[in-house]
From Swiss-Prot:
Chain positions with Phosphoserine modification: S286, S290, S370, S373, S465, S470, S595, S604, S612
Gene Ontology CC annotations of this record: endosome membrane; plasma membrane
All copies of domain Protein kinase, residue ranges: 289-576
Gene for this chain: BAK1
Entry protein name: BRASSINOSTEROID INSENSITIVE 1-associated receptor kinase 1
Binding site for brassinolide: W59, F60, H61, V62
Topological type in the membrane: Single-pass type I membrane protein
Intervals, Cytoplasmic compartment: 247-615
Effect upon mutating F144A: Loss of flg22 induced FLS2-BAK1 heterodimerization
Transmembrane intervals: 226-246
Outcome after substituting S290A: Reduced kinase activity. Reduced interaction with BIR2
Amino acid sequence: MERRLMIPCFFWLILVLDLVLRVSGNAEGDALSALKNSLADPNKVLQSWDATLVTPCTWFHVTCNSDNSVTRVDLGNANLSGQLVMQLGQLPNLQYLELYSNNITGTIPEQLGNLTELVSLDLYLNNLSGPIPSTLGRLKKLRFLRLNNNSLSGEIPRSLTAVLTLQVLDLSNNPLTGDIPVNGSFSLFTPISFANTKLTPLPASPPPPISPTPPSPAGSNRITGAIAGGVAAGAALLFAVPAIALAWWRRKKPQDHFFDVPAEEDPEVHLGQLKRFSLRELQVASDNFSNKNILGRGGFGKVYKGRLADGTLVAVKRLKEERTQGGELQFQTEVEMISMAVHRNLLRLRGFCMTPTERLLVYPYMANGSVASCLRERPESQPPLDWPKRQRIALGSARGLAYLHDHCDPKIIHRDVKAANILLDEEFEAVVGDFGLAKLMDYKDTHVTTAVRGTIGHIAPEYLSTGKSSEKTDVFGYGVMLLELITGQRAFDLARLANDDDVMLLDWVKGLLKEKKLEALVDVDLQGNYKDEEVEQLIQVALLCTQSSPMERPKMSEVVRMLEGDGLAERWEEWQKEEMFRQDFNYPTHHPAVSGWIIGDSTSQIENEYPSGPR
């Protein structure tokens, strides 16, 4: 009898525990479900948001921590419309709320002020209206606040000045009114953060007072004038010869040499969150740009490791392009625009140095180097990149590039996407570097740039033939970078000729796929520790990105969705059908079609005569 009673009690205990787990686990899921129900989703981006699941951690575009608590919601550029909901304030561990570039209307909920862990709030390029909630001043960890290109009105809440962690602020293109705060965190921001609003412009700094010169007798003036004239003549003779000699020496010296100037000619100022360093400060940090501190060199110049006075490690990129007169203001403007591109997967520009003869950019130091160095130049004591890390690198770098293409105004085309330009932070998170430099180095040109900047093996065929780059140029380079991640090999390697293989990595991979040799192309350092289906999916994304026609390549935002598991199968099936049609009717090849891998011949033939800049 007792045993019979124990069974139903045990059964009910399980049900109660299950109910408790579901209720606690679904608290955050309910908040996100409320958001889903408030939004129109024509592209079915939120289709996986199933409210019956225990937690939302398996949903697309949602990231959780090890405790199954939501830390990130990525719904930028998702073609969503509707309104935000107050339940968003019930995500206690949320760090990133990315809802930019949609058609969201209504007001910003005051409850967002409850998100005390929030680091980034990106609601720009929507149609939000009403005031900026003063409750956002509670977000003491907020670093990035971008509300630009909406219809927000009213005054800027003074509570925001107390958010001392704030590094990036963009309130531009909103009908905001009133005064711009100048205290607290707002003391760092420049007019670019408040452009095209109805805010009262910041007052210009008054010029320093000029001390009046006391009058002197006429006779004294004549004597003083005579003495001054004699001194001036003597000084002219004294400095004429050295000045002529210096001018002659500069003309004879190669134009790509750098001249050091005193730090006094480059006073330290701040441009928003961007610091302007003195040349002397960077000379000391890098031991006068010593060769022993060189981290790398490439088409834009050399990169030096440096240690600032406070002990912070930095990477100093010393640009090598010839300078032209009058380009300082444009260079400074471009640098500030680059600094506004802030994303978890983009290398943050910390500061710069500009003198009449020098252009230097200062970045955080990345202790784990680049993907290329981890794949091919790691010391024996360092373990190879495992497969999960490579997957994270693929997704992180795609997110960074998608941000450059879709959410920077004007958009930034990288023009040299490769493993050497994907850096790794302390957690081996991918950080895209060297973006914006191609345009920065062309700042003195007033015409369309036709010089091809890039690296052999990564250059898209249309960019090579026309000199015109686009987002799809970057997509091609990204696809080749994925193949580097999978194979561990270089995009262009003459050593493959020894085995009668293609020197171009893309062609080599296609050849192996046609021969059904999938295992032969996977990096041997992985030692078989990967899932075949995951490798195949990453190869599929790479091949879609490296199609000959730029029109047929996906956008980087589409690549992100495919890597997150949304739409790859359909896109791949469609491409396979098109390839089969081409091979059957238009472009017969010597290779038989392989079931599951129908690969067309590469058309990206790049001659060796084109310059390459290994980084």
